[in-house]
């Protein structure tokens, strides 16, 4: 059974795992070392998470184990649109992918952000990433193409 809930403060360190898992690796490409998440352009997603009022995170718990997370914060990241729009990141451990858990996480986060009054949410995704379709189904629209990536926004 899958339970979607807010992350607990003592669990925030798990976002490092999900940040690494969120890195899209095309078929046949060697995964980068885990130390890649220490790079400044990636640390913006997790450093000090929970300290700002616009930091929100939901986790998916399957049989008592955290299987995935979706989180947003207003940050100057790849998905940055403006200083009022939170950027979204989502990731699951590989063994939980393809079961609809990511869709549940995404939809519940969007519902929560609507209730909190956010007018829109943004994200950046590589064009080859299988999650692109999930974002489109959730209402995200491409607002800018950036080489291999697209900047997407969903208006609430």
PLM regions: where:
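A short beta-loop-alpha structural element at the N-terminal edge
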Residues: 2-17
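Conserved GNAT acetyl-CoA-binding A-motif
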Residues: 113-126
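Short alpha-helical
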Residues: 10, 14, 66, 129-130
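Short glycine/proline-centered loop/turn elements that form peptide/ligand docking sites
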Residues: 102, 106, 128-131, 148-153
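Conserved acetyl-CoA-binding loop of GNAT-fold acetyltransferases
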Residues: 136-146
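Conserved acetyl-CoA-binding loop-helix of GNAT-fold acetyltransferases
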Residues: 89, 98-111, 115, 136-137
């Amino acid at each position: 059974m899958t339970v979607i809930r807010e992350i607990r403060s003592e669990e925030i360190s798990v976002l490092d795992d999900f940040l690494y898992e969120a890195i899209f690796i095309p078929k046949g490409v060697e995964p980068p070392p885990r130390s890649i998440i220490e790079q400044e352009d990636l640390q913006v997603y997790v450093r000090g998470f929970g300290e700002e009022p616009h930091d929100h995170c939901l986790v998916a718990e399957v049989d008592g184990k955290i299987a995935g997370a979706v989180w947003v914060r207003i940050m100057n990241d790849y998905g940055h649109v403006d200083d009022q729009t939170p950027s979204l990141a989502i990731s699951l451990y590989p063994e939980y992918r393809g079961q609809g858990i990511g869709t549940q996480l995404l939809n519940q986060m969007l519902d929560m952000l609507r209730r909190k009054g956010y007018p829109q949410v943004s994200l950046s995704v590589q064009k080859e990433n299988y999650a692109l379709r999930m974002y489109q189904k959730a209402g995200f629209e491409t607002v800018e193409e950036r080489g291999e990536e697209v900047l997407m926004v969903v208006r609430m």
